C-alpha cells in the first residue's frame, strides 16, 4: 500500500475539526455519538483521511462500547498496531497503515473467530455502501 503524506495544513484543509482532532491528534469522539455506531448498512469502511479500505460491514458487531466495533480488518496490512501508554494504562492503538491516522484501539475481548474487538471512532471512517 502506497503511503500518503500531507502537511499539517493540508490535513486541516481536508478534514473537519473533529476528524482532525481524532485522526491527526489522537483524540476520541464521545461514546454513542458517532454516525456509524448503530449503522447496519452493508459496505466497506474506508479511512476518512486517505480512502484506504479498512473494515467490512460483515465484521461489524455491537460490542456495547459506544463506538463501532469490528472483529477483523479487511487486511492486517492495512493497519498498524502500536503500544499506547496514555491515560495511565497500556492499550493497543490502531492506526491506518497508509496515512498514519489514529483510528481507535484493539482489545482482546471480541467475538470469535479472532477474539478481537477493533473499537474505531466513527469520524475516522467513511462507509462505501454496497448494493
Swiss-Prot record:
User: So where does Zn(2+) get bound?
Assistant: 47, 50, 96, 99
Which is a Gene Ontology cellular component entry for this protein? cytoplasm
Give the EC number(s) listed in the UniProt record.
Answer: 1.8.4.12
Matching entries from InterPro entries are given as:
Met_Sox_Rdtase_MsrB, Met_Sox_Rdtase_MsrB_dom, Mss4-like_sf
Which controlled-vocabulary keywords does the entry list? Metal-binding, Oxidoreductase, Zinc
MsrB domain sequence ranges: 8-130
Q: From which residue to which does the signal peptide run?
A: none
Q: Which reaction does it catalyse?
A: L-methionyl-[protein] + [thioredoxin]-disulfide + H2O = L-methionyl-(R)-S-oxide-[protein] + [thioredoxin]-dithiol
The UniProt note on the cofactor reads as follows: Binds 1 zinc ion per subunit. The zinc ion is important for the structural integrity of the protein.
- Which Pfam families does this entry report, sorted A to Z? SelR
Q: Name one GO biological process term.
A: protein repair
The record, for SUPFAM superfamilies, names:
Mss4-like
Tell me which domain of life the UniProt entry assigns to the organism this sequence originates from: Bacteria
Family (UniProt): Belongs to the MsrB Met sulfoxide reductase family.
The name under which this protein is listed is Peptide methionine sulfoxide reductase MsrB
Extract one GO molecular function annotation from the record: peptide-methionine (R)-S-oxide reductase activity
Q: Which cofactor names does the annotation list?
A: Zn(2+)
Q: Which residues form the active site?
A: 119
Amino acid at each position: 500500500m502506497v503511503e500518503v503524506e500531507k502537511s499539517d495544513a493540508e490535513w486541516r484543509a481536508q478534514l473537519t475539526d473533529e476528524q482532525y482532532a481524532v485522526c491527526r491528534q489522537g483524540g476520541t469522539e464521545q461514546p454513542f455519538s458517532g454516525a456509524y455506531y448503530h449503522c447496519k448498512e452493508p459496505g466497506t469502511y474506508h479511512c476518512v483521511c486517505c480512502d484506504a479500505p479498512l473494515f467490512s460491514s460483515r465484521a461489524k458487531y455491537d460490542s456495547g462500547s459506544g463506538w463501532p466495533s469490528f472483529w477483523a480488518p479487511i487486511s492486517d496490512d492495512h493497519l498498524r498496531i502500536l503500544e499506547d501508554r496514555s491515560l495511565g494504562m497500556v492499550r493497543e492503538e490502531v492506526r491506518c497503515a497508509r496515512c498514519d491516522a489514529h483510528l481507535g484501539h484493539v482489545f482482546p475481548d471480541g467475538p470469535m473467530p479472532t477474539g478481537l474487538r477493533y473499537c474505531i471512532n466513527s469520524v475516522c471512517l467513511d462507509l462505501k455502501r454496497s448494493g
